[in-house]
């Protein structure tokens, strides 16, 4: 009698956090490529573009324009900036990520955290 074995191959993605960290690293090391605007579609300009990209590894992330400064308000792009934004620092059931939101929103943009306390008066519809 004979025996059979079955082999199956598949690709599996790594953990989502690992993919995110990899992409974040690529983003921070991305190469800016300057292409001449209005250079046309001539053979010479196509050759220059091909030469520019041939010197860049296929594994590198490239961009044509700088990313906006997310710390600053930019109404055109709909970015609120970080100045004056509320952050969660204390409270029950907050994750580590949420507790560090003040540091991310303010600290990484060179701003200080301003703590404000407010007294709220409201009707509780109490019956005695």
From Swiss-Prot:
Any one Gene Ontology biological process term? cell fate commitment
- Disulphide bonds annotated for this chain are 71-109, 87-102
Give GO cellular component annotations, separated by semicolons: extracellular space
Give the record's glycosylation annotations as residue positions: 74, 93
Lipid-carrying residues in chain (O-palmitoleoyl serine): 1
Mind telling me how this protein is modified after translation?
Palmitoleoylation is required for efficient binding to frizzled receptors. Depalmitoleoylation leads to Wnt signaling pathway inhibition. Proteolytic processing by tiki1 and tiki2 promotes oxidation and formation of large disulfide-bond oligomers, leading to inactivation of wnt8.
Q: GO molecular function terms here?
A: cytokine activity; frizzled binding
Report the main location listed first in the record: secreted
Q: Where in the cell is it found?
A: Secreted, Extracellular space, Extracellular matrix
Q: Which UniProt keywords apply?
A: Developmental protein, Disulfide bond, Extracellular matrix, Glycoprotein, Lipoprotein, Secreted, Wnt signaling pathway
Note the InterPro entries from the entry: Wnt (IPR005817), Wnt8 (IPR013301), Wnt_C (IPR043158)
Positions of transmembrane segments:
none
Role, per record: Ligand for members of the frizzled family of seven transmembrane receptors. Probable developmental protein. May be a signaling molecule which affects the development of discrete regions of tissues. Is likely to signal over only few cell diameters.
Q: Which family does it belong to?
A: Belongs to the Wnt family.
UniProt protein name: Protein Wnt-8
UniProt source species: Thunnus thynnus
